[in-house]
Amino acid sequence: FSRDDGDSPFLRDDKTLYQSCLLCHSNKEMQRGPVLDGMESWYILDQLKKFKNGQRGRDPKNRAEFLMAASMARVRDDHEMLRVADYIGNLKPKDSITTIKGDIDRGKKLYSSCIGCHGAKGEGRQDVKAPALLVQEDWFLLDQLRKYRNGLRGTHPEDIFGRVMVESIRDWSDKDLKDVTVYINSL
């Protein structure tokens, strides 16, 4: 996000606001955060609020989230977050490169415990704040699963649904995480 410098009463358009996000959130190799194009606007807004209020990004051991939380200091207000979230939600998802290898059949069995929140086809459910999984790159899904399992995400006392994720996969091995990621990527 970028803040307008100066006293201009005019807000920049949504695309211009989003441009500063692309330093990390594009498929160019820079900081290489997740590509956000096509993610649901409600989920983007929810996550932006978590970064802004400290539910995410306070642990320097989770470098990517720590950097994201620092960038949120430049966001003016909730309206700016809403505008960016709506803009992202209207972008078409980008094609992604498959990078993770695993056992798809084993992953399907593991995924059966994810269906209640993320849906049989990975479509997600807003009522339990579970995002669709189909637009995210496999390396990022695996990274986030590891962060949940290792307590680097979803542990804030106010992050109820994040804590559900932590508990759901706490005992999963790295092979489990890779296999379920490969299955999700096949949906």
Over which residues does each language-model region extend?
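The feature marks the first
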Residues: D14-N53
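Axial heme c-ligation environment in periplasmic c-type cytochrome domains
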Residues: M30-D37, K52-L82, I88-L91, S96-G102, ...
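N-terminal export/targeting leaders of redox proteins
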Residues: F1-R12, K49, N53, S186
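Solvent-exposed, polar/charged alpha-helical surfaces in well-ordered, non-transmembrane soluble domains
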Residues: K15, Q19, W42, D46, ...
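Disulfide-stabilized extracellular ectodomain repeats and their linkers
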Residues: Y18-C21, G33, S41, E65, ...
